[in-house]
Amino acid sequence: KDMLLFPGFAKSFHVVATPRGALRVAPVTMADVLVIQNKGGGHGEIGFHLAQQLVSRGDAVTILHEGDGPNPKEAHRAYGELPSDVKVIWGGDLSEAAACLAKLEGASFSSVVDNWSKSPEAIAPYATAAKAWGVSNYAYVSSAGMYTPNKGDYGAVGEECAVKSSGQRQAEEKIAEMGLPFSYFRPQYIYGPAQGKSYLAFFFDRITRGRPVPVPNGGDQLVTMTHAADNAAMIAAAVGNEAAVGEAFNCATPSLVTYDDLVRLCAGAAGMECEIAHYDPAGFDKPDG
């Protein structure tokens, strides 16, 4: 991995949705949706936007949230903006699935969006509950980090690309083996105004302090940056949508920028000039700490 930026930053491929994986928008029925939401990281803002979008079209939304309550992170502070009829249940340790499911007090749901599980062991009890409820769709948000393009390959990576057997890939396989009507969503780099983990904060920090921004190699590698609300819109389109069942979707914008251009966009947003310093990641020794 290349250092100083964010994991995988200097990889020379990006994900795009292929025609085979394009989400066909079909009429959807109103749903009772359970969103299983993690407490932060790159996925931390998705649940907020997803709840807003689902409620706006008439769905009922319950968020089973990791953690004991709101913390100072941006995504949690934004929850005050959610409609009052969005029910947020703080589940504590979601790996204690029996206790967390008991907090639902016997409620059942027609669709589940799992934005928390990262292993087959984690997803299994929630998938078992979903199967008992007879859900029309179990939308699982995994990661585009599972793709393993051939060494030397450049350009777009579609859903048919080979994947490694990561915990998230095994979770995908688990819900398929269980016979659930699944949809997989594989986001890459996510940003947004309430992001708990900002991939862009490093750039803004360097730019606003007048420091050079280190960019690996020549800076002409392409990357996708997708707004959390757009990720949520793709996922929301699958809820209650039979056309989405059994499909994997790259959850990323088709708009591509180079790493150098991404730094310049950040500088423009900050109203400042920027200096880019290219470096060879292969010859860089990461300091300890």
Listing of model-derived features with the role each one plays in the protein:
Residues 28-111, 180:
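N-terminal Rossmann/SDR dinucleotide-binding element
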Residues 206-226, 238:
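A conserved pocket-lining segment of Rossmann-fold NAD(P)-dependent short-chain dehydrogenase/reductase
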Residues 44, 153-173, 197-201, 224-225, ...:
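Short-chain dehydrogenase/reductase
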Residues 1-23:
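N-terminal chloroplast transit peptides
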Residues 185-204, 221:
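Flexible, glycine-rich beta-alpha linker
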Residues 109-115, 139:
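N-terminal Rossmann-like NAD(P) cofactor-binding module of classical short-chain dehydrogenase/reductase
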Residues 124-178, 183-184:
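Conserved Rossmann-fold NAD(P)-dependent oxidoreductase catalytic core, especially the SDR/UDP-sugar
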Residues 232, 237-289:
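Mid/C-terminal beta-alpha module of Rossmann-like enzyme folds, strongest
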